[in-house]
Each structure stands twice: as structure tokens, then as C-alpha cells.
Amino acid sequence: MEIRHAQKQDIPRVMQFIKEHWSERHILANNRKFMEYQHVDRTDRFTYVIAEEDGEIYGVEGYISMNGEETPDICGALWKVIPCNYFMLGKSIREALMRLTKCRYMSSPGINMNTSGRVLGMYGQYVEKMDHYYRIRDLQEYRIAVIGDKTVRAAGSENSSGRLAYVSSFDEMERYLSEEYLKTKVPYKDKVYLRYRYFEHPIYEYDVYAIVQPKRRSFVIMREVSANQAKIGKIVDFIGEDEDLEGLSTAWDRLMEEKGYEFIDMYSYGIPERIMERSGFKKLEGEENIIPNYFEPFEAKNVDIYFVSNVLEGLHLYRGDGDQDRPSM
């Protein structure tokens, strides 16, 4: 069994493998343009590692580089092996991927806890669950969420002086971000990555807001989704200082009112719960409230997102990292 870094000429074979062994309708099995958007990096390299023998692929794992360093920070993406005589092939692919990319840090949101999560946890990787926070709008009827407990932190119960200012272009965002500052974050997402990921996406449209309190140094990245003739706002990434999120409850309420959202939610790891509470959010626990995550197709259920990583210190992960926030079909 040979485990190697894929080449661009392998794209059709990897797409066919995904179609046959993951899902016939998966976007990465059917849309080459999107496959190349997500998995051909700035050096024109196809970001997959494959395991093959006698011309047949037995396993693949994709990844996304978040900066252009020699030892980059990366996020794992689709990871799949099929039955064969090679013991622990999935683990071997992961080890080869980390070696071949020379990555500093690697995190993989969206792992299956019954398969890869359990295996990697046994071999020294950190396996954790992302926190799921939400703030609901006070409505008589909810068409997306199922709300049994409408308790929310009242706007103004903490200092609510923070404001959100819409950012219309990456050039505007870039004025407030230095590469040196971005390098202090784990993972390090450089300017090239941020522009490409959120301002040049071929299918999704993202809304970027600067937090103004008292100056602009932190940014919230959101995506609007709809179902059942209703809309919500997903926070998919956050760039900045955790404490800047405090005191935004009034700003969130104003945004929900302007946009007509039922709620705003956020999956994250690394932001202290006390800060999210002071921002007006509530941590989702139990099943009394249902804050759906799946919209393609829509599923009215709560979803836990687990991740595996080789680092936890300083780590901040969000739904937009890896391929958790991408079209499904």
C-alpha cells in the first residue's frame, strides 16, 4: 500500500472515490470547480493524501492550509477509508498527511466519534466537543428553532456599548489587521486565506462585521441561512480578541431585528463561557431547545460537533474551519 500526496491529475479519481464510498450526491464528488476551490491551494497543489494499491484507492484525507508558511497550520477535511488488509489505514493516512505537509498544528472539526475520533484519541491526539451558543429573538412562533425555554440574557444586563459595523470588502477589513497580529493566533489564518475563504467563495455569501468598542480590532463572520420561510444567522468565524465579544447583546438583538433572524448561533472552542454569556449568548445544553445546524437538507435536531487536534493551548476553532461550513450537494 502506497500512501502519498495526491497530484492534480488525481482529482477525478478522488472525486469518484467519494462518489462511490461516501455519497453519490456529495458536492466534492460532482462539482470539480468547487473541489478545486477548496482543495487546490495557492501553490497549485491538490490538498489530499491518498492510499492506493494496484491502481485502486483505499483511503483519502483532504486538508485546507490556513497560511503559506513552510510549517503551516491546517484543518482536516473529508477523511475516508474502505475495508482492506492494511491495519489502521486511516491512522496511517493521517500520520502521512502531517508528515508530508510539515504542519505545525492540525485540527479536524466534524469527526465521527465512533470511528476516527476514538482511534486518534487512543494515539495521543486531543478529542474535544465544540461549544454551541445561541441567542434567540423574542417571537411568538419559531419555524426553524424549537424553543421550550425562551430564557435569554436580557440586553443591557451587562455593558452593552459594543456595536457591529458592516464590512463591505476585504480591503476594509485588512486596514485593521496586521499579519503580525494574525500570527499570534492558533491557528494562524493569514490574509490570503481570509480573503479567499470569506470574500471569494464561489457559492456562499458571508457577512463580515467589525466589533466597534472602542476601536475596530475584532471581526465576526456570519452566513445567513433559511428554511421553512424563516432565516437565521450563523457565526462561522471570529478573528480578534475574545473580550471584544462582551457587551454585544443589544447589537445582536438589533441585527436580528434588521435581518429578520429567529436566532444567531455559534459553534466554537476556546472562548470562555463567561465571555459568551456577557455577549448575550446561552450555551445549548439538553434537548429543551433545538437549534438546528443542518440546512442542506434541513434537519430539526441538535448536532454536536467534535474535533481532533494535536494542540489545545491557545486553540480557537469555529464552524468555518475545515469544511464544516460548505455546500453539501
Where are these regions (language model features)?
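Secondary-structure boundary elements
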Residues: 54-55, 99-103
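Conserved acetyl-CoA-binding loop-helix of GNAT-fold acetyltransferases
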Residues: 78-100, 243-255
